[in-house]
Amino acid sequence: MGEAMTGLKRSHMCCDVSEVLIGSEVTVMGWVQRRRDLGQLIFIALRDRTGLVQAVVDGNNSAPELFKKAESVRSEYVLAIRGKVAPRTEGNVNKNMKTGAIEIIADELRILSESETTPFQVEDEITVKDDLRLKYRYIDLRRPCQLKNMILRHKTAQVIRNFLSDEGFLEIETPVLGKSTPEGARDYLVPSRVHPGSFYGLPQSPQLYKQLLMVSGMDRYYQIAKCFRDEDLRADRQPEFTQVDMELSFVDVDDIIDVNERLIKKVFKEILDVDVPIPMQRMKYKDAMERYGSDKPDVRFGMELHNITDIVRGTEFVVFKNAIEAGGSVRAINANGCGHYPRKQIDSLVEFVKTYKAKGLAWIVVNDDGSLKSQIAKFFTPEKLQEIVDALEGKPGDLILICADADRIVFDSLGALRCEIARRQELTRPDDFRFLWVTEFPMFEWDDEENRYVAEHHPFTCPMDEDLPLLDTDPSKVRAKAYDMVLNGFELGGGSIRIHRRDIQQKIFSLLGFSDEDAQERFGFLLDAFKYGVPPHGGLAFGFDRIIMLMTGSSSIRDVIAFPKVKDASCPLTDAPGTVDDKQLDELGIAIVKTEENEETNE
């Protein structure tokens, strides 16, 4: 049973109680971190979101009822304590606590709420399985590390809002219930009761609405928007996520990059006291792929890719020969200092790249005496092996790793491998922030399964002016006015200059396989708006959760979202998604049909 707060008002947060208040009466409220009983002295460490303060109940100088109540207190009880602030004796000062120089001599203690024994301790220095933490997320969030993440998230949002407001942006909310216009991933669908058989789509982004806001003359828009994607999860993705979304009129690529560089500089300085140098490095998509095997390269370390196709061309080694004849390439990285790896560890790298569809790896070890060891040595002359090593500036103690396949597989495999080796070798620090822009993405990517082009970003991205003629002759070579901000191997945000001409937009839809009727059905409202005067415009969206993850050094965005989902898009806390009763389904005109495999599908 809990007591009422009647007559008590909190005067201070726990960590606001300091030496300047010595002799003053304060009232604090919070959770019991721990209780120590030393006979006639009971010490209670009380915690709120600011931290801890110690309260003391002295059995020799307090009412028996107060002392008895203090004896009954247990961890995670919620208390209100009123008393006078006093200095701690010299031997009892705790320099590890912000309030370690003082304590509160309790005159009144109320137990506002009792607590059962928690499934895990509210401490940072504990190991708890993720499923248990997330099932009891409200307890997990009490831990200082989780509180710190939530507070940093709040402060970052405030800095962003203030900066964009000062830059002339208007914060405008766009609908959550919209039309399903898939942008690459599956939409979450919401059935309409009023319009049987029709569905809303939850937004993957506010893309179309923010373009309409530019047509409306809003000039500069932003919102911190909730977005949804029904896709497989990974460490840095969630089915519902938050974007810092913006759109600007009468701008070019440089304008958008400039405002976002200054935004990031402001955020990192005010929140982390980190100076981000601007202008940031820019790298064309083609160069990023050639050098790092990724369109979101981690540039905190080297280990760049080298194209050795010409060096090994004409070889009888069938793996290299077949890759080259099929139009692929042979590329390599130099894992500096990894020549000491035992064969078992090298084999683990071979297995690693197989997850990226590579058939394997060739390797060359540069021994300490400069001699070479390789499983492909019998296929090459010593001079040819040395030529490969020299091309990668190999030196004693290095390990050369070679992949031969289609370009996409080689890039994916070596791009991931360099990051895996960097992880194993501890070549990076989470507090080393290396930003860059990747620009000039391909406009289209060919989808073999669907036998058509798909948009690399989305179908509203504007082609480079000089590439417009290629839309009619060779769409695969068209570059987009698109740009991604990358930080330490993660895409922080991406955007583009948009198409503002109706004729070009219709041509893009046609290249993507949309008939005029399909385009009108899906995007007719946008095409209609383009009849009435459209300013040149562009924008960008940052993954807010991902930014916070990187700023806090967390390994997953789950740690920076208050109530996240897990890999199967379920919520361990609420057991969502859940079933609904037949009456609700009947109102929506939906029936659940069990297939022969006993799987449930909506019909």
Set out the residue ranges of the language-model regions.
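Class II aminoacyl-tRNA synthetase catalytic cores and aaRS-like
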Residues: 1-603
